[in-house]
A protein has these predicted regions:
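Boundary/junction segments of secreted and surface-exposed precursor proteins
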Residues: 1-16
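Solvent-exposed residues in well-ordered beta-strands and their adjoining turns
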Residues: 14, 72-74, 102
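Residue-level detector of buried hydrophobic side-chain packing
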Residues: 9-11, 67-71, 99
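Edge beta-strand at a domain terminus
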Residues: 101-123
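A short, surface-exposed beta-strand/turn
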Residues: 77-97
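Edge/loop elements at the starts and ends of beta-strands within beta-rich repeat scaffolds
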Residues: 2-5, 60-65, 90-93
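Predominantly extracellular/secreted and cell-surface proteins with exposed
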Residues: 21-79
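Short polybasic amphipathic segments
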Residues: 35-40, 92-102
């Protein structure tokens, strides 16, 4: 397990179809356990993702983090997700969000609106 820091974020990216993909994400390690959440909606396809658990939180760079977990897709359980986020400046300047699902769906890029925020460990 990594860190003690945590990440939160929300906003939107352009999806592969050119539509808006809205998301809310958080992840970290608290009291020795992974925690977090994910919600994502692709407004082009109608795809809806709701995270149901976090199985990994990893430091991948000075301002980037990797989160993995389980999810429901369009209300159906049994999927997994991978999220990569980067907090590249304030407020949300050049921040990135990327999502991959076990069903093959992928979307990601620089935020068109919103912010990824990396937080220091709570004391």
């Amino acid at each position: 397990m990594s860190g003690g820091d945590f990440v939160t974020g929300g906003g939107w990216i352009n999806t592969p179809s050119g539509a808006r993909g809205n998301f809310g994400v958080a992840g970290g390690i608290k009291n020795g356990a992974f925690w977090g959440h994910l919600v994502y909606i692709d407004h082009g396809t109608g795809l809806k993702v709701k995270g149901t658990g976090v199985t990994m939180y990893q430091v991948t760079g000075p301002t980037s983090r990797h989160i993995e977990g389980t999810a429901e897709v369009n209300g159906q359980p049994g999927f997994t997700y991978q999220v990569d986020v980067a907090d590249n400046g304030e407020p949300g300047r050049n921040d990135t969000f990327a999502l991959g699902l076990s069903n093959g769906y992928k979307a990601g890029g620089t935020l068109q609106g919103g912010n990824i925020q990396l937080h220091s460990p709570c004391k």
